Structures are given as C-alpha cells and as structure tokens.
Amino acid sequence: MKVTLVGNGRMGQQVAEVISRSNDHEIAAVLDVDARITPEIFHGSDVIIDFTVRQAFMDNLPAMLASGVPVVVGTTGWDDAMEEVRRMVADARASLMYSANFSLGVNIFLRTLREAARLIAPFGQFDIALEEQHHTGKADFPSGTALRAAELVLEANGRKRTIVRQLSDNRKLAAEELQVASVRLGSVFGKHTAFIDSDADEILVAHTAKSRAGFAGGAVHAAEWLAGMHCEKPGFYTMDDFLNERLS
C-alpha cells in the first residue's frame, strides 16, 4: 500500500515510522501542512493519511476528495463542520474515514464507556463526569476523543443532556449537565477517565496512552481497511464501522 502523508508533525512522523517498519507499505510522499495541494499530487497513492490542523484540512479536503484516493483523517477540531464534510464526501462519491483517535485501545474504552453509561441510566444515584489530560502543546480542548466520549454518554444515558466544558464561578452544575474537564500537563500523551460516582461507591473507566504508537498503528490499520472498502462501497466511515466489521 502506497501512502501519502499530509502533515509532518508529531503524529505524521509517528505514522511514517510505523510504515517504514512494514514490509507491505511504503510512503509515496510527505506533504507539509503549508503545501499547495492539488488532486494530481495523490496520483499513484493507494490512501491518504491526514494529520494536520483544522484550517489546513478544510482547505485541502476538496483536492483530496477529487483525487479519487481514499482519505484517513486524524485531524481534529472541525466537529462543527461534520455535516458539510459528510456532504462533500457523498457528492464526490469518495471514501473518508475519520476518528479523533485511531488507537484500538481508545476505541475499546469508548465502547466500554458507552455500555457503562447505559447500565447506570436507570439508577439515579449514579452521576458521571469526564476528564481528559494531554501535553501542553495540544491546542484544542476538550480533546476530540473526550468530546466523542461525551456524545456517547449523552446518547446512552438519557439523564445527561448537555456538555459543559468549563465551570462558572457563580452557578452549580445542573443534574442534566455532563462536565468534561481538560488538563494540559507536561508531556502527557493522552489520558481519558470517566468517573461514575454514588454515595456507596465509585467506578472508573479509563484509558492511558503510553506513547503515540497506538494512535499511529491504528491509523495504518484503518488505512488498510478503508483502501479495501473504497473498492466495494465508497462513503464516510468511522472506527465504529471498522470495529463492527472486525467483531462480526
């Protein structure tokens, strides 16, 4: 599989390292975040992997979709444009897979959290809150993974209806509000924790990344899967689609 990497930051470099150790894949090109991108750049590639920033991703997306090459997107911070991106993918009859976090461990954590949120829903004595920790160089907060975790809690629980990213000094948190706290600390790769609390006990559902290798390896697995799906059924995919097929 020939891969073009868009973005040469920490994650792009980690993905390149994973690919360099593989006998089955190779890097076709590495494009800097500021590169002028046209559809022709991607000709000869089997898949594109994008780890850039919101503005670069949105600017480059039309050219990536027009290339006809399936696109794996790890760039976060564009959730408010999700419907627009889905429409662009459909209009181009393209294949795009997005995840705020491609780590298999994180996605297993998210599934576990969704089930825990569902199980506590009938029992009003349980409250739930989320916390994410990342290195001080991470610009967006809460993290894309934390926001996805919050969405899953809202979908599965029913008692929580809105997400609160920052607490105010002059009001209490309402019972239907789900707090998502963010910590930026040192060189933390990523830690996500769900706190489920009652008067009698506390349940923790957590995932801690030990390195970026899990994120990068998951992105390459996703690229392999998407390249195969592109031939069968173009569309907008997530890690849920990937896991559902692997578990079926």
UniProtKB/Swiss-Prot annotation:
Cellular compartments annotated: Cytoplasm
Gene Ontology molecular function: 4-hydroxy-tetrahydrodipicolinate reductase; NAD binding; NADP binding; oxidoreductase activity, acting on CH or CH2 groups, NAD or NADP as acceptor
Gene Ontology biological process terms in this record: diaminopimelate biosynthetic process; lysine biosynthetic process via diaminopimelate
NCBIfam families from the UniProt entry: dapB
Active-site residues, Swiss-Prot/TrEMBL: 134, 138
Catalytic activity: (S)-2,3,4,5-tetrahydrodipicolinate + NAD(+) + H2O = (2S,4S)-4-hydroxy-2,3,4,5-tetrahydrodipicolinate + NADH + H(+); (S)-2,3,4,5-tetrahydrodipicolinate + NADP(+) + H2O = (2S,4S)-4-hydroxy-2,3,4,5-tetrahydrodipicolinate + NADPH + H(+)
InterPro entries with a match to the protein in the record: DapB_C, DapB_N, DHDPR_bac, NAD(P)-bd_dom_sf
Pathway in which the depicted protein is active: Amino-acid biosynthesis; L-lysine biosynthesis via DAP pathway; (S)-tetrahydrodipicolinate from L-aspartate: step 4/4
Residues given in the record as (S)-2,3,4,5-tetrahydrodipicolinate binding sites: 135, 144-145
EC supergroup of this enzyme: oxidoreductase
Residues reported in the UniProt entry to bind NAD(+): 74-76, 99-102
Known role: Catalyzes the conversion of 4-hydroxy-tetrahydrodipicolinate (HTPA) to tetrahydrodipicolinate.
GO CC field: cytosol
Record organism: Chlorobium phaeobacteroides (strain DSM 266 / SMG 266 / 2430)
Annotated keywords: Amino-acid biosynthesis, Cytoplasm, Diaminopimelate biosynthesis, Lysine biosynthesis, NAD, NADP, Oxidoreductase
The protein's name: 4-hydroxy-tetrahydrodipicolinate reductase
Similarity comment text for this entry: Belongs to the DapB family.
Pfam families to which the protein is assigned, alphabetical: DapB_C, DapB_N
EC number, UniProt record: 1.17.1.8
